[in-house]
Amino acid sequence: TILWCYARNNGFKVDGVDYHSAADLTGQANHLGVTLQADIIKQKIPTNNGGYNATKHGKTHPKVYSELTTDHPIDLCRFQVANCYMGRIPLINSGGESKGASDLADAVKTAVINKRAGGMGLIAGRKAFQRPWKEGLALVNSIQHVYLEPRVTVA
């Protein structure tokens, strides 16, 4: 079973900042998915952290933010992997909506972040399928190359 563990709540937007993809909130969603015995967790790539503090929910110790994570994209994604029982349950990140010319670069960057964080893959549906066949195939092949490249390792 692949479980979409997206955090959705209007309260996750605070002072103009959107925390729907915050590492701490999505990490908790991943943990809940693992607890429900999902075989694979699908999650958005994290874009920030500190959602619990901003929304005034949870009792996360400050050291989680100061010592266990940084704002680096790989560390934020690694926090998601950690909440999947340290990768025992595979994490795949979603590729997001197609934005046009930057899709190839965005998909490769997301794949590198996911792989270096210990994730297991990337779903790039709209980025690949909402374009001409050759372009979509090139995008999928580029993602595959990231995961098959032995020099791209866990950071």
Specify the residue positions occupied by each region the protein language model found.
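Short secondary-structure boundary segments
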Residues: 45, 95-96, 126
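Short active-site-adjacent structural elements
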Residues: 100-104, 122-124, 130-133
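C-terminal helical cap(s) of enzyme catalytic domains, especially alpha/beta-barrels
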Residues: 117-118, 129-155
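Alpha/beta enzyme core
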Residues: 1-92, 104-120, 145, 149
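Proteins with a high burden of low-complexity, intrinsically disordered sequence enriched in S/T/G/P/A and R
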Residues: 1, 125, 153-155
